[in-house]
UniProtKB/Swiss-Prot annotation:
Residue intervals of the ATP-grasp domain: 266-449
Region annotation Alpha-L-glutamate ligase: where it falls in the sequence: 162-466
Annotated source species: Parasynechococcus marenigrum (strain WH8102)
Protein name according to UniProt: Probable alpha-L-glutamate ligase
Cofactor (UniProt): Mg(2+); Mn(2+)
GO molecular-function terms, A-Z: ATP binding; metal ion binding; ribosomal S6-glutamic acid ligase activity
Length: 466
């Protein structure tokens, strides 16, 4: 009979086959599978077998230690994450060392940056071998910081990548955190720049960008603008200055401006022959009745030109309601689009994420009960979806029409085919990354690398410190 090991809620273990002399694991008998933090996961074929390459930051909040490995794939498995979303993960088999015992376990690979532990030890890996004392921790011994430093010192890497600035307003937003993390994980120096704290020197001989009281921003290779609608004018001015300084931007200022002006964007879509709901725009209240008739009558959608994330969008269910809202908005000098309501969509739409002229991910969004807006910020839900070829073509064409490198393209399914709703130049990452499990932030960083012709240096094979 095998002697069982008693462990606490967290323990240090090692995975020698991966070159991990020590990694802290969360012990969770409530989880069936074990998982390991991994990123830059790339599948490939070797001797007609499926393999993956991946990288690991074994120490929480320390990205200077990077280990790269290649492993054969056992399978791909659906695993329900903490948000209740099922992710498809690669599964590998590795030898686990826990205390003085060792045995093979299966590990699923996923990005655990948002979680407190780089590894989770689930019940399938412990059955018949481990007893868990949930009130204890480090039952098999703890490690001091200096011990960890000695173990991982040979594996620390200096950042020799690009210097990339994220131009935004709040570094704590999910999308911004993910972009900063993704850049660091690929070996780049990431810097957050608050839009409002940047200011410029306009000089044809020596244009400059200053930040927070006089610091001159120099040697930046690329900028990712993530500009809030409320600061579009200033944010685009700052982005243009970076462009004037010869710095690559992931979405230039003019395409961002086009995407923020719903009327201009719609006119560009029409010019490029892209299918969209019938839309009307007028200035005088005398034209209200004909404007409503123009788009097929009520019910219809009313959109403020300056709205975003579902704000400033109203469903007018009757002719009288539509007239009242339109005339009220005109009396306030608010610019308003009137748009055909696509009833057969049933409160659903598609969000296609486009990077570098390709749809890299897509979700179907469903409106919350009692609402017609499917935006996740308005309480809608999302799930991964396989889009049709004509939907993929429409998303890519819309992005090109505006000149964007990265975009979230909203499409609605109708009886006459896919219709283009809107293109977002700063698409949120949380909903779509959670629903699909795809590292979209990493793909955005890779697009910067592609634009600049930067080739990532292969990391050396890991060595276990003695």
């Amino acid at each position: 009979m095998t002697r069982k090991i008693i462990v606490g809620s967290e323990e240090w273990c090692s995975l020698p086959g991966l070159g991990l002399p020590a990694i802290k694991a969360r012990v969770d008998s409530g989880a069936a599978t074990s998982s390991l933090h991994a990123f830059n996961i790339v599948p490939f074929q070797r001797d007609e077998a499926r393999w993956i390459s991946f990288e690991v930051h074994p120490l929480q909040n320390d990205r200077s230690v990077v280990i790269r490995r290649e492993s054969p794939v056992l399978e791909q498995r659906g695993v329900r994450n903490t948000s209740g979303i099922t992710e498809t993960r690669y599964v590998i088999r590795e030898q686990l060392v826990l205390g003085e015992e060792s045995w093979p376990i299966e590990l699923t690979l996923t990005n655990r940056d948002a979680m407190g532990y780089r590894m989770l030890l689930g019940r399938e890996a412990m059955v018949g071998r481990v007893l868990v004392d949930p009130e204890g921790s480090h039952q098999l011994g703890d490690l001091r910081q200096d011990q960890l430093e000695a173990m991982y010192a040979p594996l620390r890497t200096e950042r020799n990548g690009l210097r990339i600035a994220l131009l935004a307003s709040d570094p704590e937003l999910y999308s911004n955190r993910r972009l900063l993390e993704a850049g660091e994980e690929r070996g780049h120096r990431m810097e957050f720049l608050n839009v409002k704290q940047c200011y410029m020197r306009l000089d044809p001989q020596n244009p400059e960008m200053h930040y927070r009281g006089g610091n001159v921003l120099e040697r930046i290779n690329a900028v990712i603008p993530r500009i809030r609608p409320s600061v579009t004018f200033y944010g685009c001015a700052i982005t243009r200055q970076f462009e004037a300084m010869g710095i690559s931007v992931l979405n230039a200022a003019e395409p961002i401006k086009r995407s923020r002006d719903k009327l201009l964007a719609s006119q560009l879509f029409v010019r490029h022959g892209l299918n969209m709901p019938v839309t009307g725009f007028a200035s005088s209240p005398l034209d209200t009745k004909d404007l409503i008739k123009m788009v097929g009558g009520a019910p219809l959608i009313l959109k403020l030109l300056e709205g975003a994330q579902g704000r400033g969008v109203v469903l007018a269910e009757t002719q009288k309601a539509a007239e009242s809202v339109i005339n009220a908005m005109k009396s306030l000098n608010a610019n308003l689009l009137v748009q055909e309501f696509i009833k057969e969509a049933g409160g659903k739409d598609l969000r296609c994420f486009v990077i570098g002229g390709k749809v890299v991910s897509a979700i179907e969004r469903t409106a919350a009960v009692g609402d017609f807006r499917s935006n996740i910020h308005q309480g809608g839900s999302a799930q991964a979806v396989r889009i049709r070829p004509e939907e993929r073509k429409l998303a890519v064409s819309a992005t090109r029409a505006l000149g964007l490198d990265v975009a979230g393209v909203d499409i609605i399914r109708s009886e006459r085919g896919p219709l283009l709703l809107e293109v977002n130049s700063s698409p949120g990452l949380e909903g779509i990354e959670t629903a699909t499990g795809k590292d979209l932030a990493g793909l955005m960083i890779q697009e910067i690398e592609r634009k600049l012709g930067w080739v990532r240096t292969r990391l050396s094979e890991p060595q276990v410190a003695c």
